[in-house]
Amino acid sequence: MSPKRRTQAERAMETQGKLIAAALGVLREKGYAGFRIADVPGAAGVSRGAQSHHFPTKLELLLATFEWLYEQITERSRARLAKLKPEDDVIQQMLDDAAEFFLDDDFSISLDLIVAADRDPALREGIQRTVERNRFVVEDMWLGVLVSRGLSRDDAEDILWLIFNSVRGLAVRSLWQKDKERFERVRNSTLEIARERYAKFKR
């Protein structure tokens, strides 16, 4: 029996996936400032025409790449939340989830694009939509867990802000300073403070 032929939609998805993966590679190597859309087709192993068909502009390719990054992280957060048990340490899980996102090697790519978006309204609008569909959704899911465990919405938001903003700050600091021992101390201090606040707020 001959293998089943792929549909046009399947072939299109495969090509788009190759282009996004190649765009990520270029961003990792050269950053936003050095990103050239002309470098992507060759790295992806597709023609320039195929790239132009799926992502006619640099903006469209960058936004698709940014969205793919955030969707992968969102799915990992959903999986973590789905496995969460009543007896689990929710504060530890939140910290681990934040670290998986903000301390991932590719966070610097998203940060680079976010900074660039400050000078590009179209890029900023697209990034904002992706953040709202992904990071805000993840935060709302964690807030729902905290509220279900007896915290008010305001208290839950305080804890989420404490954890996520602390880890985000460590991620930004790591761009110019590597101090693993201090990072661990600050991370453990964040965990300790958040646990204390959780115990205090829990009804």
UniProtKB/Swiss-Prot annotation:
The keyword DNA-binding applies. Residues 36-55 bind DNA. Residues 13-73 form the HTH tetR-type domain. The keyword NAD does not apply. Induction: Induced by p-cumate. It comes from the Bacteria. Keywords: DNA-binding, Repressor, Transcription, Transcription regulation. One of its GO terms (molecular function) is DNA binding. Involved in the repression of the cym and cmt operons which are responsible of the p-cymene degradation. This is HTH-type transcriptional regulator CymR.
